[in-house]
């Protein structure tokens, strides 16, 4: 029986905690907090909520994920992966619908952890992950074109194709000043790593372009550059905790979006934790991480936040700056809280074009175009799943993409697994070289008596194997008296295989054919006995070795 698996890394991290580690965590937390600020604002606005909700998410979820998660260095908060799904939920269900969906996603994540699904989630097929991640990146870029170029247009359609049609129709409405701010911001962020490894390019771009826009407005009379303050009213007041009203109809309608948030959050957080493990030489606890993520996504919306998960970029920033325990993540949350309380009003001066530039760079990083092009050289089945997930993400939505992608991957997996099982007929004699289910090693071959058919199954006996078996039996011309089925290389049998084997035995008995099993291992034999196979065939027709099975066949045909 599986035990309850909730062991936050915070508990083990503080056992041997010392001043040197604390100072390293403090410095890392301070830097990560500063790095997280522009991203939290940008992700919040891009998701369709106010900028302070993005910061509140980073504060609340960041604290909980560090305190209760299964990774020592994971930094949590809003991420680009959620932009598409969050914006879609808000458009369809409103802010209250998003709050309920996030709460439900938190419950799902806790359930994943309690059911020990942490390891399984990491094995979601790579083409699906690349497909929807690349699709999200393209969608994020598409949503930022208007602000990046300062297009003077009243509204932007929600449909992907319609967006680009409208953009094409409004090329003459580009504001050159806003476009300049957006493109220069992209250039600053892209070139910043060459000059500074510690200070993030997004922060440099926001500071430089905010000051530049203030100067342009003050001394050059430029008023066309839109800022956060032009679109939102900024508040630095912490919201009260509120629980939304839940109805059964609302819950039913939000199951699919909530499950998408949970799956997406689980994948991203566990990928981030795995990458971090490789850098610091540690091993995260996947199930504890999922439970911590779940609690964070329950607490965050209660305080007005949006979905959160582990963020790879912020986690790596934490590691690169010396963070080695969850204390660094908690410090990062405290730094963001102080900025929120005392400096939030200054955010109103940040240009929207600059934030769009930040998200354009984020979308480029998410696109994974190298992985995408590499997968295009893989088998056609992988390419099909990749392209299907990608196009469903950008044309429809992420919920549909993940659902269809996983179904397709499961079908392909079933087909590939069925191909691993080989069923063959042995016609004249049995080669005992390197055999494992015979007693008389001094014989090299055993002859098959007349009136006896011998079949050998190599691999798991489940879906697919049964059909191969039936097709192969149909090729024999004469009806035998005995059918021997060698199962020495069958590691397990599932309910489908059991059903097929039982039907084959019943049909054989109706035709007057005796079925003899040979070389059944303990695990498979236990399944057969639970299904009363020894009564169906008779104990004497279940043999440990092929030579015993042939001896039994000789008795039956004599």
List the predicted regions and their residue ranges.
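Transmembrane helical cores of multi-pass ion-transport proteins
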Residues: 1-427, 431-432
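Short, contiguous clusters of charged residues that form electrostatic/catalytic patches at enzyme active sites
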Residues: 28, 186, 190, 467, ...
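Active-site-adjacent beta-strand anchor residues
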Residues: 76, 131, 517-518, 543
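Generic hydrophobic alpha-helical segments
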Residues: 86, 167, 469-473, 549, ...
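Short secondary-structure capping/turn micro-motifs that flank functional sites
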Residues: 334, 524-525, 544
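The feature marks cytosolic C-terminal regulatory regions of anion transporters and related permeases
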Residues: 365-536, 554-557
